[in-house]
A protein has these predicted regions:
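Adenosyl-5′-phosphate
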Residues: 1-4, 8-10, 104, 188-193, ...
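Cysteine-centered catalytic environments shared across enzyme families
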Residues: 1-315, 321-324, 343, 595-599
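Hydrophobic (often cysteine-bearing) scaffold residues that line and stabilize catalytic clefts
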Residues: 90, 109, 166, 225-229, ...
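Short, solvent-exposed helix-helix connector turns and helix-capping sites enriched
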Residues: 102, 151, 383-387, 494
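A mobile, often basic/glycine-rich helix-loop segment
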Residues: 367-392
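Short low-complexity, flexible loop/linker segments enriched in glycine and/or proline
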Residues: 324-329, 373-376, 513-516
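Short, well-ordered alpha-helices that flank and scaffold nucleotide-derived cofactor binding pockets
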Residues: 263-267, 348, 573
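Conserved adenosine/adenylate-binding substructure
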Residues: 38, 110-114, 245-248, 312-369, ...
Length: 600
């Protein structure tokens, strides 16, 4: 929910015309309410004096801006040996952490954070981003100055700047190859990657990694590993101990992850928080696909509790493309999030009920893992008898053929180079470090901020992620059960009907229907008028043909088809290009290089 923008120029800001009033105001009508400026720094934000302060220490003069969560503040106070009764600002606490441990001290924080340290004497700037990217930092290097902000949009609105389109990113976006977590659709604007910081000194920028996840052998017994996971799940949902918020909301799909978050909070909370759940239902769809999408029977297992204030909405009434201009205004650049209407509707309803703290079960399946990388490890290490046994029991439990499971898990990702060189843990780590998670958090975070909501992701707790990475691989998928260790850890807390489910809703059916019924006019209009910048990047005739076929039989494209995704990506990008300001004068077929430096 923190929003900021800053300009630092150690040659002096005098004579520079810097305009930081955003052209966009969120629903809370709260712009940049706080400001700091001197001859070299202009900093505007919507936080408090907890977030930004000036310090004179160790013969230096430092401007510090930070945003940390309460749980991490408690941890840091203990780590630094500070008396709990001492009233210390977040900014001073983070400065003390840096003085004592340097950049490596940031590993002490388990949740989202921002830490910006401006050394006014040595003329040095450092901007740190958390381990997974819950908090965002964008930067723009221009005219001997560096601009920092919590959002792309803030920097794109800076006056008197000429920007150029990043055509490489556009191409990758359209072809689902955009794996970068540093660049944006504008060459001049970049992002600090998760677990990294940028250092700006003598008009040069370095991007430096300050931490990485540890992989190590786990010698604990299976039972101890299960109990360890249960402990960390409890710890990760134990938020707002000071009861700053009287109400806490939960996005509740009815899946295992969202059900785990709300169930653990409800089971272990020792506060008077009121619990609100927000769920999408699809009860009015054709009966042929109703059971493939609607999860209300699972949602009701949670929402029937008398201490939960349930708010359900009809997912059929919503679509992302029908409000595309709104999303582009909030996010500022193209995005790939076809089901964005779900968190948006939840945030909207939450704000109406004065719920301004929300918990989200995002990516529990990624963090804990379904465990199929264990099957791959067995295959590449020639443990084929064990592999066949695991596939056989999985086949019987999921009612899928052994051939289908083998093809999907082994053959579809087969590589000769993996033989005798494949590690299930390293594969899990690669998935965790994918840029997809960071991008999804950024997008949801901007939406949450629009409604004045602070969003929390218990499964993205750093300690929990590292623990799950090091769980023995055969505990992640055992006896045919994906995420076996999670299902054991939540036993007795999450309703059995949810804990034992082996299916998952396929929202692709809802997406295809909304395209054909609700978004047909917009899609046709965008396909008929491609922006000149996009024509050389995509086969429009093929896409138009696929769209016409999809309108005839949308159900055919709801599973294992890239057509809906291709249409969504094209429409979003094309609409954004048409809405660009006149200041975007040139096209450049390049991606700005971001050089990563090892932390010393």
């Amino acid at each position: 929910m923190i929003n900021f923008i800053a300009c630092i120029d150690f040659e002096g800001l005098k004579g520079k015309n810097i305009y930081f009033e955003s052209k966009y105001h969120d629903q809370t009508k709260q712009g940049f309410t706080q400001s700091y400026n001197n001859d070299y720094v202009l900093f505007r934000h919507n936080g408090s004096d907890e977030n930004l302060d000036l310090f004179t220490k160790k013969d230096g003069k430092f401007l510090v801006f930070t945003k940390i969560f309460e749980e991490d503040k408690i941890t840091l106070i203990k780590k630094l040996g500070i008396n709990e009764n001492v009233n210390i600002k977040d900014s001073e606490l983070m400065l003390e952490l840096y003085f004592k441990f340097g950049a490596a001290g940031m590993k002490c924080l388990s949740n989202g954070f921002i830490f910006i340290l401006i050394d006014l004497i040595k003329e040095n700037v450092m901007a740190f981003r958390d381990h997974i990217g819950i908090k965002n930092i964008c930067y723009l290097h221009s005219d001997n100055s560096i601009y920092l902000s919590s959002s792309f949009r803030n920097l794109f609105n800076v006056n008197n700047k000429n920007f150029s389109l990043n055509l490489d990113k556009m191409d990758n976006f359209l072809n689902f190859k955009d794996s970068s977590n540093t660049n944006t659709f504008i060459n001049e604007i970049n992002k600090v990657p998760p677990s990294h910081f940028i250092e700006y000194h003598q008009d040069q920028i370095k991007v430096i990694q300050y931490s990485e996840y540890r992989l190590e052998d786990n010698l604990a017994t299976a039972n101890d590993q299960i109990n360890g996971l249960k402990h960390l799940l409890k710890k990760s949902v134990y938020i707002d101990k000071s009861c700053k918020y009287s109400k806490i909301g939960f996005t509740m799909s009815g899946g295992i992850d969202s059900s785990t978050v709300i169930s653990f909070f409800r089971e272990f909370k020792d506060s008077a928080h009121k619990i609100f759940s927000f769920s999408a239902q699809y009860k009015h769809l054709d009966k042929k696909i109703l059971n493939l999408i609607d999860e209300s029977e699972y949602q009701n297992e949670i929402n029937k509790s008398t201490d939960i204030y349930d708010t359900s909405f009809d997912g059929q009434d919503e679509s992302t493309l029908s409000k595309l201009d709104f999303y582009l205004e909030v996010i500022g650049q193209p995005f790939f999030f076809p089901n964005l209407y779900l968190p948006n509707k939840a945030f909207s309803l939450a704000s109406e009920k004065d719920v301004y703290l929300m918990m989200n079960g995002n990516d529990g399946d990624t963090v804990v893992s379904h465990g199929y990388e264990y099957f791959q490890e067995l295959f590449y290490n020639l443990r084929w008898i064990k592999l066949l046994k695991e596939i056989d029991v999985t086949s019987r439990l999921r009612k899928q053929s052994r051939r289908f499971i083998f093809k999907r898990i082994i053959l579809n990702s087969f590589s000769l180079s993996n033989f005798f060189n494949f590690s299930a843990k390293k594969k899990h780590l690669d998935v965790i470090c994918s840029s997809n998670h960071t991008k999804a958090i950024e997008i949801q975070g901007l939406l949450a901020s629009y409604y004045g909501i602070e969003e929390r992701y218990p499964f993205y707790n750093r300690e929990l992620i590292e623990y799950c990475l090091n769980v023995t691989p055969d505990l992640k998928n055992k006896h045919g059960q994906a995420r076996y260790i999670l299902k054991e850890a939540i036993k007795g807390i999450v309703p059995e009907k949810i804990r034992k489910r082996v299916t998952k809703a396929n929202l692709g059916h809802a997406l295809c229907l909304s395209f054909v019924v609700k978004d047909n006019e917009l899609i046709n209009a965008q396909l008929s008028k491609p922006n000149p910048a996009i024509r050389e990047l995509i086969d429009l005739e093929d896409l138009r043909s696929s769209w016409e076929n999809m309108k005839v039989d949308p159900r055919k494209y709801a599973t294992n088809s890239l057509v809906p995704s291709r249409i969504f990506a094209y429409v979003v990008l094309n609409r954004w290009l048409d809405s660009l300001p006149l200041k975007l004068k040139k096209l450049e077929n390049k991606t700005q290089n971001v050089y990563l430096h090892p932390y010393e």
